[in-house]
Amino acid sequence: MLSVDNINADSNYIIVKQLCNKLIKTGKYNFFILLDKNRKYYKDDLHKSVKIIWLPLPRSKKHQVIHFNTNIFREIYKKYAIDLVWNNVVERGHHIRYFQDTLLDNQRVKVLNYHHYVIHRSLEYLSNYLPCTHILYDQIIGSLGADLNYFHTQHCYNMLIEEAKDILLPDQVKKIEDKSIVKLGGYINKIKSKYKYETYTFIYNHRLDGYKNWKDTFEVFDLLYNAGYKFKVIITAGDKGNLGSVNKEYVEIKSFSLHSDYINELSKCHCNVINSRHETYCISIAESILNDQVIVAPNKVTFPELVDQDYPHLFESKEEQYKILENLIVNNIREYNYKESNKLTIDQHSKNFDKIITDLFEKDLYESYFDRIKKESTKKEIKNYLQTRNEIDLTDFKNFIFKLGYASQSFPMSKIKKILNEFNFEYITFTNKYQKK
């Protein structure tokens, strides 16, 4: 799912890119990324072996998540043998899992739903919850149909299950629970500071929208400023429609086209304040933690999971929030030495994610798809075809098998690919062919 016109600045793209770059180093993966051809994109540090497939997507996020172009996916499934769809649009999980025309469930493409967000009752009822009821239903059924659901936080998982219990029967909820896993994630490592502002500086890198409760945050800032305290607030992620409301004497509004420039600005600040009532992770807070900034946040949603245990600067009320901020400024507390911040790094996340994928395919390692072919004459033909070649074009091999009297129901691309692997052929992204090791 893409949120902004500049793909390179999209938070979902950044997470996927960083994970791809890490996982490729293991030598175990080939990645294809589906991106919107109608949005802006420039070549960045995405690993050169990652193959980009361009396709048209709706502009609106709400339209993207209910959009499933069967013609495009049919062509993708015809051309490539895919083991796993790392699905960032969880509403489509059941379609992607069962779209393939095959009779055998264990030969379908596996689907790993990657939950970035949840439609939950903690969102504004009239603007973001009630109008998205159809998306909520799709999220739940998409989660039910996937092989595995990955959640960055326990709170994110809890929200989905809470909604599912209102819609599904208990045994169906149990199916989602049994195919779900929670592991804290992250997409960067420690952020070092070359320079810090001399004036006590808060970064506000959250949206000025709805559930972020940004008005509450700036009401507290106003109280501090009117009490004579000296500080400034850098806004980096403001929604244009509300920027006029925060055009205050202590505020500086900055925008960045490059993510690296934004990170550099963040590294100059001391504290991150948020009043959000709905989160599934909160990348902006994780970034500040990895720069050892002080976090002042509600003692709820995902924040207790992101900070250390017994972290001292989570609040229960606006009055408590004011006292915490006042204490930070008066005592010039400009950093916090987190003991558990490694749990939020891309290094840790990539290790966890690698294990999750490996475990998902563990059973396949002990199964031979070639040996399960019933007709000996077919096995002989396939074996001869593969033993006389060092390079295989997947489409040619598929056509060869189909000429033996088979079709996609009994020989889907995923099965054909596994047979190639059993005969020590590996996929080479640059040539789009399989070569013998």
Where in the sequence are the language-model features?
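A short, active-site helix/loop in glycosyltransferases that binds the activated sugar's phosphate group
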Residues: 136-179
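Short N-terminal targeting/anchoring amphipathic segment
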Residues: 74-94, 112, 150
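Nucleotide-activated donor-binding/catalytic signature segment of Leloir-type glycosyltransferases, i.e.
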Residues: 242-263
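Conserved donor-binding/catalytic core segment of Leloir-type glycosyltransferases
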Residues: 150, 187-212, 218-225
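Short hydrophobic beta-strand element within catalytic cores of glycosyltransferases
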Residues: 294-297
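Aromatic "clamp/platform" in nucleotide-sugar-dependent glycosyltransferases that forms part
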Residues: 277
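Active-site proximal beta-strand in glycosyltransferases
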Residues: 84-86, 100-124, 128-135, 143, ...
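A charged, aromatic-enriched C-terminal amphipathic alpha-helix characteristic of glycosyltransferases
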Residues: 333-374, 408
